């Protein structure tokens, strides 16, 4: 039985990718990103009350201090609750005197509370973190281009980097469309996705290179790429599934603090499988035709 030709249907896979990327780009320009205080600067107050309080009660107090737009999170897990003793408040950057006034007002109106954690991130620090995050991702791409060029050749490297850029863009698309918060852990997730995705792509490229040594003149390069992809398909599927099992478990049971981190990896790993399986080989063929020796 003849196997499905991935190369011959490359336009379909690239069209799907293009639609997703267009949606993402529109969302990025229209809605932007929900940047956490790691990037924008701000304050985090982790408070525990003696009695359960609601979001509305806390927001009413904060509104009197011009902090009504603050993000208020109840509890310490993903479980949605109407009231809780544990409250996490994310605001714009406030001074120590403002914080003391807010805490005193919360105590007077909602009961005694204990401050478990206070974090302040200045706007300058947040801006520096954005530059560092972008620099880290770009540096990883540059190093991979150098490594793959040495290990294989430039055409393989270019195809791999385009696949990685797509993976990063797809992950950013989901976070923009769903308006999920992007913090420093998101950068770590992106770098993890880049490393995982390039690993899957390298496996396919390594098989293509091996098959080139036994390539028959009457066999088209498209058939060779298809054969290489299918020869590595079982490995790719098993590796992706076993990795996703762990990531899904973290996503479901890991708690609020790493929820977005695990979601970024979940999206990125799925995209990595898609690009390495359905796009990378066809992109190598494209660069092979354009950059003939």
Swiss-Prot record:
GO terms for cellular component: plasma membrane. Keywords: Cell membrane, Membrane, Protein transport, Translocation, Transmembrane, Transmembrane helix, Transport. GO terms for molecular function: protein-transporting ATPase activity. Disulfide bonds: none annotated. The chain crosses the membrane at residues 10-30, 130-150, 158-178, 185-205, 244-264, 267-287. Its main location: membrane. It is found in: Cell membrane. It comes from the Bacteria. Part of the Sec protein translocase complex. Interacts with the SecYEG preprotein conducting channel. SecDF uses the proton motive force (PMF) to complete protein translocation after the ATP-dependent function of SecA. Belongs to the SecD/SecF family. SecF subfamily. This is Protein translocase subunit SecF. The gene is secF.
